[in-house]
Design a protein with these regions (language model features):
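Acyl-donor-binding surface of acyltransferase catalytic domains
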Residues: 1-17, 162
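A short beta-loop-alpha structural element at the N-terminal edge
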Residues: 12-39
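Acetyl-CoA-dependent GNAT
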Residues: 31-36, 44-96, 100, 105
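Conserved GNAT acetyl-CoA-binding A-motif
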Residues: 96, 125-136
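Conserved acetyl-CoA-binding loop-helix of GNAT-fold acetyltransferases
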Residues: 101-104, 110-127, 146-150
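Conserved active-site alpha-helix within GNAT-family acetyltransferase domains
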Residues: 111, 115, 139-157, 165-168
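Extended, charge-rich intrinsically disordered regulatory tails
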Residues: 123, 168-171
């Protein structure tokens, strides 16, 4: 297994637990609601949409709990006070996995939490005997693209999202 990624002082790992599904959804919403991703994927800009997305991810037979984490900020006694980051993972095939929705809330960005999340999730994929992991990222999210590159991801293709009919009518 990979070395357990270190978190900054005052943060802790929260492993997947079904009771935490709304916590994941809330962090996902806070992470993406004001970002370009929420315009491309409207469910990310809506708390109910994030709850629905988390349910869709976690009820799939391909869901991998050991790749799914929250990072929480803790008080002096170690009690979680603010959930700051979330990640989930799915099995795509026998040996291939896919990272889903790496999200860090705006006030906790720049602390290395995204990198730690990716590393922790990759360890879970490795424990599940995955030898290849993929993810999708919005090309204009330069910070995320750079992060993924530094942990070993490479661009293998570019995809374009179809324009919705309602947006066409606006022109």
């Amino acid at each position: 297994t990979l070395a357990d990624p270190e978190l900054p002082r005052g943060f802790t790992w929260v492993a997947w637990d079904e009771a935490a599904i709304d916590r994941h959804a809330h962090v996902k919403y806070e992470s993406f609601r004001d970002e370009l991703d929420s315009r491309i994927f409207p469910c990310l800009g809506d708390l109910f949409g994030c709850q629905r997305l988390m349910t869709e991810i976690t009820t799939q037979s391909s869901f991998l709990p050991q790749t799914t984490w929250i990072i929480s900020q803790v008080d002096n006694e170690g009690n979680p006070v603010t959930d700051c980051a979330t990640i989930q993972g799915l099995r795509q095939s026998t040996r291939n996995g896919a990272v889903q929705n790496v999200g860090v809330i705006p006030q906790c960005r720049g602390l290395g939490l995204g990198r730690a999340l990716i590393q922790k999730s990759l360890d879970g994929f490795q424990q599940s005997r995955m030898n290849k992991v993929s993810l999708e990222v919005t090309a204009d999210n330069h910070a995320a693209v750079g992060l993924y590159h530094t942990v070993g991801f490479v661009i293998v293709r570019s995809m374009y999202r179809a324009v919705e009919e309602s947006k066409l009518q606006a022109y």
